[in-house]
A protein has these predicted regions:
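Juxtamembrane and boundary regions of transmembrane helices in multi-pass small-molecule transporters
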Residues: 115-167
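Transmembrane helix-loop junctions in multi-pass membrane proteins
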Residues: 2-9, 36-47, 75-81, 161-167
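Alpha-helical transmembrane segments of multi-pass membrane proteins
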Residues: 60-73, 99-120
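Helix-loop-helix module between adjacent transmembrane segments
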Residues: 31-38, 74, 78, 112-120, ...
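Hydrophobic core segments of alpha-helical transmembrane domains in multi-pass membrane transport
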Residues: 1, 31, 66-74, 151-165
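Hydrophobic alpha-helical transmembrane segments of multi-pass integral membrane proteins
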Residues: 54-94
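Membrane-interface interhelical connector segments
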Residues: 41-60
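Core transmembrane alpha-helical segments of multi-pass membrane transporters/permeases
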Residues: 7-42
Length: 167
């Protein structure tokens, strides 16, 4: 298919990894950081903070708080898997699932709401910085600028779908 010999595989793999740099291992590091945050009790701290913002029993504000927090924390962490454990424990369970929402639907939509944040942050190097590096773009954030409006629309759609179908 490529008309290259198999001996080119190590050379080309090395070249691409060197071009991408340290961003290659960033997703794994961020995933590990998420588990450290979860073990440290960050979810409980977030739950206590959100308890003052989201009124008891308000499903809409619970859904909005959960989806937006997933996106924002994913932007900070750079990885939706890292944010998922912390935000679901801190907001998803007490403010959405405990109000009668379907946990499977909340989990699926919560995780993908986090991916809306992935599209809007340089911390998600594997999605945003690596493509800019490979394409040798002048502005390393160009990919993010293009993706941000779509990500915001998708986040709003996630909120609507979760509110309408999870309960």
């Amino acid at each position: 298919v490529t008309k290259e010999s198999p001996t080119m595989i190590p050379h080309e793999s090395s070249r691409i990894l060197q071009q991408m740099g340290a961003t290659v291992i960033l997703p794994q590091l961020l995933g590990a950081l998420g588990s450290v945050f979860a073990k440290a009790g960050v979810g409980e701290v977030i739950a206590s903070l959100m308890g003052g913002v989201i009124p008891d029993g308000n499903r809409l504000l619970g859904v909005i708080g959960y989806c937006v927090a997933m996106a924002v924390f994913t932007m900070i962490m750079g990885n939706a898997f890292a944010a998922f454990a912390v935000i679901t424990a801190g907001i998803g369970v007490p403010f959405v699932i405990n109000l009668g929402a379907n946990p499977a639907l909340v989990g699926a939509l919560g995780l993908t709401a986090g991916y809306c944040g992935t599209l809007m942050t340089p911390m998600a190097a594997n999605f945003n910085i690596v493509p800019a590096s490979i394409l040798e773009m002048e502005n390393k954030n160009s990919v993010i600028f293009v993706q941000a409006p779509i990500a915001i629309v998708m986040l709003i759609i996630h909120i609507i779908i979760m509110y309408l179908f999870a309960f």
